[in-house]
């Protein structure tokens, strides 16, 4: 007689399972990862911190070129499909190709000993999604146990998955050329069958970000904001969310001894307030030190899982070594961080919404207060810029415009996310701020001390009492003085020896904003927002 879970796997096409290890304990996972007979990327290595380290092979990051969504009645009118005009990662896949990939993965997982992890994506019971992850690799089960919300014994008894992830990382697709796909590897979603298939890539983040893409599909259609942001809450219950692309300071600035962390990367905002999607953190570890990021450093202990780090012969980790990848990572359960919201990672409505940008052009002010229209404009623009070296040794800024500060994970059109976010903000009486953690006319990056002073002024409300003036071209309201912030930096023009230099750079950057925003002007709502952007 097949067990309930065996029957459910058989319905998916996974048959003759030798053994099901369901929701293993951390102790069990440790024993599985340490088995001497394991080979290749299945093998775990114990480090002196107590955490296990694994390698993910040639894939040390996500593989967006291999991401597909089945084009059918459910998805065709909702998904933000890639097009010649606006490229994104949501490529259509036909039903026949999906069927053949599904058979590849279910065949790979049949006749095996499997790990089945049942978990929730979303800390709020009313909005969460029940997820089942099926894999033959112990550390992949460990990764999802760390990253998603772990159910209670009682919840497991009656667990019915809304969505299934079948991870067949050991199998590749021999027919990819005939099927018109990018490569033999695949990350495919079927929104009707509610299944994600993974093949050829071992990278753990495909499961995490795959489920984020799904939450980004389902929740906004129900009027719930879905956000690529960190979030924290003060002693008075005041919630702040921090949007920003990689490297702008999301994790650093939301980790604040005066406030409790709700989560560091993915959140929803429903009728109850802001809630974390995850039960863990997935932190970058390149050049990690206890001095610079004590919370993350101390979270790397037993039950944490390191990816693609260099482990020395004595078992210690060389965090400065990026020879495998710059994208070295660690996943750990959120309770490895001390100052968190417990027992459930959720809080009330956000009163402060902070957009972080690292402007390498040296144009934007360190902080400005946004109108509702500007909030939509800068959210849709999703701007940041990096400094990249050029041949002649000049470092020139490279702008990045990533819609909603997370274009890679958007399943619907960006204007949908802006509309839902602003509606939530209006209902909660929230205020948005644009905070530049990048550079100014001095050629130096704005100091973390000044940025923390700015964040404090936003969170304690003192920015509301400050006098403001308008910055030309961008028409942004900037404060003239804030407590514990160097007043000389608040107007970016004052950081240039020659103010005409700022003007030239500002015109250049404004032109880039205008050009980027053209893609949103195909509908009336987008056209109406142009006035909130820079004026040349």
UniProtKB/Swiss-Prot annotation:
Molecular function terms, GO-annotated: ATP binding; metal ion binding; phosphoenolpyruvate carboxykinase (ATP) activity
The reaction(s) catalysed by this protein are:
oxaloacetate + ATP = phosphoenolpyruvate + ADP + CO2
Residues binding substrate: 62, 203, 209, 329
Residues annotated to bind Mn(2+): 209, 228, 265
Quick one: where is this thing mainly located? cytoplasm
Q: Which domain of life is it from?
A: Bacteria
EC code(s) of this entry:
4.1.1.49
InterPro entries documented for this protein: PEP_carboxykinase_ATP, PEP_carboxykinase_C, PEP_carboxykinase_N, PEPCK_ATP_CS
* Gene Ontology cellular component list: cytosol
Q: Does the keyword Lyase apply?
A: yes
Q: CDD domains, per this entry?
A: PEPCK_ATP (cd00484)
Cofactor binding note: Binds 1 Mn(2+) ion per subunit.
Query: Pathway involvement?
Result: Carbohydrate biosynthesis; gluconeogenesis
Q: Which cofactor does it need?
A: Mn(2+)
User: Where is ATP annotated to bind?
Assistant: 209, 228, 244-252, 293, 329, 445-446, 451
The UniProt keywords, alphabetically, are:
ATP-binding, Cytoplasm, Decarboxylase, Gluconeogenesis, Lyase, Manganese, Metal-binding, Nucleotide-binding
Q: Where does the record place it?
A: Cytoplasm
* Role, per record: Involved in the gluconeogenesis. Catalyzes the conversion of oxaloacetate (OAA) to phosphoenolpyruvate (PEP) through direct phosphoryl transfer between the nucleoside triphosphate and OAA.
Q: Which family does it belong to?
A: Belongs to the phosphoenolpyruvate carboxykinase (ATP) family.
Complex and partners: Monomer.
Per its record, how is this protein called by name? Phosphoenolpyruvate carboxykinase (ATP)
The organism encoding this protein is: Actinobacillus pleuropneumoniae serotype 5b (strain L20)
